């Protein structure tokens, strides 16, 4: 009698198979014996020298990342030992609920992870057991899984897909070198770190070859990704992984699966026929690689030969890949996930992350259960420390907030609101105090009826790790307002501080411009334009006045470059497929950012603004002066300022955006490159209030002009809709 199985998936971390009750226990047992599975599970002790043995008391539970009948996956923080403060994913398996096959898979996953050490494979740091449970302590990867990216966020090109496939090929080759067949390759099992590099996870279905031909015979994996030899159960080798590799490549390039019928039976029939209609929009190299991977006979499949992965690496599709640089992570990923604090779980299912993290002791399965998992303990040889950050409270409604807090905690439960810091058209900024720690922050309170804060939040999450961009600490939503908790800028506004400074020189002005231009170049290179870079949005983190403490703030008008369907675009996609008028608009917005920096630089050097004489100038007068492109570069401070400074100012304030310097050109200008030789003589300035009033009048005049139409992200894509019934919907920002 055939053994019936039902698949249960806990997203991103763990897949197990729950066995339906079979009418014939003997047939089930014989099937297990055929697959080389025994009841006794013996796992050797593995404690590396210099590290203490771990136990559950050493880990603080922060959030639930996933849950099933077998147990849970938690986000945890180590509270003792040399790696105290480090965040991990803790997989907790209840011995009593694990069937024999699942116990074997748990043992197998632990064994494989303990043996594997590779940049593109999730790392096991500890393994241990109590009377009722097994524990695996793994890397916590904040970038979510590749499926989310494929379906909801980014437009990929062949060049981008090539990057992910190349990293994946190196990971598979490493496993194959250890005699391991992965057998469950699919986007859900490919996680992204915060930089966008991949790590494959979920080794519950992986298997070391069992017979002298290095073949395995069990029927496992996700049906659409199975190789023909897995479907027909005639035994499979590592070559089966290269078929799945081809399925993943096809899906990433086309948005659909190559072999998918209306039901399981039809899908299996299509796989066994291995006949594929090749999309003609794919490059000749991509088509060639797919044909070489989709060979029905595994012996003829690319990667199955004596050279193994070298056959794949030599294929023309990968001709542009530098494999050594790739392994060292020196090639920049095409996409950077939006991640904030280390403990953020934006890319995990809110059904799980909203739950209170509790780990019950677990009921021992039987008197001799402990012996079934002999020697489960393991400690990694090296533990990389990350800076510990405070755990911040929790809240509701906006998708991002769902991920952080659940449904029942409000901003005022965790923070006490203090005085106003600043007031804008759509928001107010206040000082606030975290009740549990007395730490001070700034909270930006946005009226949702006037502005959708999603774009601002996503930009801050994705790029707020830059040292000169304000850091988003937490997000709350009460339905009417969104609360963005950010670091408090104690040093005040840049221009205010400079104008009140007793001594300010041309050399200091160049240091300030260098820091801000470098930050804008970073944003522009990522397809982000600020569009509101007035001096009041450039602040100091502290009272030092050091350029390193400068932060770019208020991304309320900022935009990420998106396709017409609202998806983000990789740099490669932008260069090859974006309409000229879209790029022109993006270039115009970037040029406006540089123009704003030109206004700031002019004011720092001259001591007054270029286009407004004071707060009483009318918008019409100011706009007329801006349109003429005329401003003074002689008299006053200008008589002692270098020609290089005048040159960079005039090129940043050029009336034609296309002739204006870009941020990267500003950084390469001699005035910046040779700034250590600039004068340190004190520059004079007008009255502080007069200058600030003139600056405010300038931006008031500019903001009266119509804003460009805003592109909003779509909530889903065809790929997400196609696979929507197969898994829970992923959250997008």
UniProtKB/Swiss-Prot annotation:
Summary of activators and inhibitors of this protein: Upon extracellular signal or mitogen stimulation, phosphorylated at Thr-570 in the C-terminal kinase domain (CTKD) by MAPK1/ERK2 and MAPK3/ERK1. The activated CTKD then autophosphorylates Ser-377, allowing binding of PDPK1, which in turn phosphorylates Ser-218 in the N-terminal kinase domain (NTDK) leading to the full activation of the protein and subsequent phosphorylation of the substrates by the NTKD.
Source organism, top-level taxon: Eukaryota
Assigned GO CC terms: cytoplasm; meiotic spindle; nucleoplasm; nucleus; spindle
Keyword DNA-binding recorded: no
Location in the cell: Nucleus; Cytoplasm
Cofactor(s) recorded in Swiss-Prot or TrEMBL: Mg(2+)
Cited CDD domains: STKc_RSK3_C, STKc_RSK_N
GO biological process terms held by the UniProt record: brain renin-angiotensin system; cardiac muscle cell apoptotic process; cellular response to carbohydrate stimulus; heart contraction; heart development; intracellular signal transduction; negative regulation of cell cycle; negative regulation of cell population proliferation
Function: Serine/threonine-protein kinase that acts downstream of ERK (MAPK1/ERK2 and MAPK3/ERK1) signaling and mediates mitogenic and stress-induced activation of transcription factors, regulates translation, and mediates cellular proliferation, survival, and differentiation. May function as tumor suppressor in epithelial ovarian cancer cells.
Family assignment from sequence similarity: Belongs to the protein kinase superfamily. AGC Ser/Thr protein kinase family. S6 kinase subfamily.
Protein name, entry field: Ribosomal protein S6 kinase alpha-2
Annotated source species: Mus musculus
Organism lineage: Eukaryota, Metazoa, Chordata, Craniata, Vertebrata
